[in-house]
Amino acid sequence: MENVRREATRPSVPSGTLELYFPDHLYRNDYVSLEGPRWAPAIKQAVRWKFTPMGRDAAGQVWFTGLTNSEPGDAWYKLPRALDTPYREAHTRWHGCFQSRQRGLPPAYTQHLREMAFWDPAITAQYLNSGPRWGCMQWRDRQIRGKEFVVTRNQFGAKLPWRSDYVPLLSLPQRPRFTAQDFRQRGLQRPCPAIGQPPPAFTPAL
């Protein structure tokens, strides 16, 4: 708890308190801060890893974190039974941190905050099936169709240099023909980028 008080007095959250490197060491249950609309405090992930030989996949193991003391499947970020009882100490403390700020806001703003920040305390939950997760989202390493064109938009139609020193958006762009900007001939008619031919001449009808 000393770390929590020390981090709460700082004006900004240092990057060392955020969970940048996964997994953290096993015996740490300090509060951390997640970047979000309300900077909600959370607890380290409940899923730890068993001791496995190096080079093997670690099997997920559910550890008791004190968030729920009756039913392990009951998530701690759901509505508690009563805010004045220590049924869920972590959720009650998280809810009380921002209760004073919400009193000075109009009701529409407080409802908007609740709708936007419902995911703040959601960390790696106690799922029965195996699979890495980041927060409450399933981690997928496969590409999403359509997203790869955003990164390499300036290289459309050209061969990508699949070299070890190639970095997207940092290496020299491989632009297709007729797409390089020429400021000296900006006013002239440029050929069509798709077919590489000049546009048809405009003949006004008399």
UniProtKB/Swiss-Prot annotation:
GO terms for cellular component: axonemal A tubule inner sheath; axonemal microtubule; sperm flagellum. One of its GO terms (biological process) is flagellated sperm motility. Keywords: Cell projection, Cilium, Cytoplasm, Cytoskeleton, Flagellum. Its main location: cytoplasm. It is found in: Cytoplasm, Cytoskeleton, Cilium axoneme; Cytoplasm, Cytoskeleton, Flagellum axoneme. It holds the Pfam family TKTI1. This is Tektin bundle-interacting protein 1. It comes from Mus musculus. The gene is Tektip1.
